[in-house]
């Protein structure tokens, strides 16, 4: 069990006692042992079935409408320290409120918005604790929270990473890498449909001197061809041993069908051909009968 409550994060808390309404005996939740924070209420609607004093429960702690710590077993879409793509639920004279999967929406003050947020639109934001108010808030000015020391972190060329697509630019798409670093996928490296807010795997193609990362959506070089060889072989098996595309097909047709570059397609096709798994003809590719 944790001794210090981490607001906006998951905490393993012990059930101290059942919360009863004074004078009525009505149960309205559990009081969790918050250590130095004192008792933290878990409302009855979040209490796991059969929970009793002495049990330990993994719960998310945030502030309720009256700014009191509250424990829940709900799973938020993001926690403090995370970048996330969230929908604006409503706005008032102080800022916008984003749906992050909890009963109380996440506040994004006007000063943390790049442009005025509108109801129904989605935004990439960073979730953090406001130092002045000690409230959990969101910021759309995500650049302030990204690190520029990817090289020191040991990220290397062709390393697989997790990315969140952040913003479209003239060069391609900006991405947040491993929830920490800025990255860029150049337009000529994109071989499938990509949208702001998408989460996917990517590969480091270059670690730049400024600490930013160039990315690609496929493994580099032979690794990409080897991965796609298996995809192409399975496609042939699933389509009566035939593919209308070949080494003379246009990059656009290959991209549309398989979401890879023509270079990767040709390398994979060559690998299958050298291993006598396929036959290349004028009208396409044929799976060898014994395959």
Regions found by a protein language model. Give the residues of each.
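Single-stranded RNA-binding regions, centering on S1/OB-family and related RNA-binding modules
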Residues: 1-291
């Amino acid at each position: 069990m944790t001794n210090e409550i981490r607001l906006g994060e998951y905490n393993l808390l012990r059930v101290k006692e059942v919360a009863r309404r004074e004078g009525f005996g009505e149960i309205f939740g559990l009081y969790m042992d918050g250590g130095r924070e004192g008792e933290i209420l878990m409302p009855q609607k979040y209490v796991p079935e059969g929970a009793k004093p002495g049990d330990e429960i993994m719960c998310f702690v945030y502030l309720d409408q009256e700014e009191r710590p509250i424990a829940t077993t709900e799973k938020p879409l993001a926690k403090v320290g995370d970048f996330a793509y969230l929908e604006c639920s409503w706005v008032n004279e102080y800022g916008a409120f984003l749906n992050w999967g909890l009963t109380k929406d996440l506040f994004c003050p006007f000063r943390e918005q790049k442009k005025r947020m509108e109801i129904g639109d989605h935004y990439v934001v960073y979730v953090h604790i406001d130092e002045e108010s000690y409230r959990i808030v969101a910021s759309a000015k995500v650049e302030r929270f990204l690190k520029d020391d990817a090289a020191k972190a040991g990220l290397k060329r062709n390393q697989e990473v997790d990315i969140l697509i952040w913003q479209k630019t003239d060069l391609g798409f900006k991405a947040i890498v491993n929830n920490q670093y800025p990255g860029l996928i150049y337009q000529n490296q994109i071989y499938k449909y990509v949208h702001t807010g998408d989460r996917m795997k990517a590969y480091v193609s270059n670690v730049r001197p400024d600490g930013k990362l160039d990315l690609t959506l496929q493994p580099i070089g032979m690794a990409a061809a080897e991965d796609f060889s298996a995809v192409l072989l399975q496609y042939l098996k699933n389509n009566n041993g035939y593919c209308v595309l070949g080494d003379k097909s246009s990059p656009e047709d290959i991209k549309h069908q398989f979401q890879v570059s023509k270079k990767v397609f040709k390398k994979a096709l060559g690998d299958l051909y050298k291993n006598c798994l396929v036959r290349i003809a004028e009208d396409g590719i044929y799976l060898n009968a014994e395959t």
